[in-house]
Amino acid sequence: MGILTEWITEWLKGLLIEGIMGNLEGLFDTVNTRVGEISVQVGTTPAAWNAGVFSLIRQLSETVISPIAGLILTFVATYELIQMILEKNNMHEFDVANIYKWVFKTTCAILILSNTFNIVMAVFDVSQSVIASAAGIVTGATDITPDMLADLEMTLETMELGSLLGLFLQSFLIKFTMLALNIFIFVIVYGRMIEIYLLTSLAPIPVATLSNRELGAMGQNYLRSLFAVGFQGMLILVCVAIYAVLIQGIATGGDPIGAIWGCIGYTVLLCFMLMKTGTISKSIFSAH
């Protein structure tokens, strides 16, 4: 009877260890896969992300918003001309050279406005180039080696049946946590790209104010917002990279149960930091 009980216990332990390792191997695979997916997503330009949406946004910007921006630029240029005339004692002390300066300034403003879409895309091309360069470093440093899982399996073999059962249930719970994390990351990454499209669609309006000293703050803040949203992808990538490196310690900590709960803690921390990436990026670029 004792031999049968021991055999059943060993069989259950083997079954639980196999289940735990299966859950954790899937967990590690999810981490590595998610890092790779985010590297691709945040490193994709608006034009390459979705050609259909990009074409729609470009048409809206050029056919609907640009005429409104043209009216705003006309108002700004006329206002500056009137202001320049009144400042010189109703043209009694007016310098003809100021007219040439005004013409040159207005011409530059028209040129910038007519190329607004290309300028906005150039901002994102710069940020995506930086992100793509960093992605190669990040994905190369977050691989989980088989040796780590082997060390964890050796630790599990020394545990009792009850502890293994509790650990199995916890490892099962962590898989659902990872699914929630994947959905959350999906919302953050895709939400950022939608925000980029929204900013791009209205780009001509703030750009039309750049040439004016009083109204130019709108355009300057808009450009800062573009850089902030662009480089938010870099912060997202850094957050996930830090998370993946921290997760590597789960297989070498010597305490499987503590490692499982540590993984949950890291997951919650990642979710919190992903929510903060937009705020941090805007504070860096002084955008509001």
Predicted regions located by residue number:
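Elongated alpha-helical scaffolds
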Residues: 102-105
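Membrane-embedded alpha-helices of multi-pass transport/permease systems
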Residues: 75, 120, 127, 184-187, ...
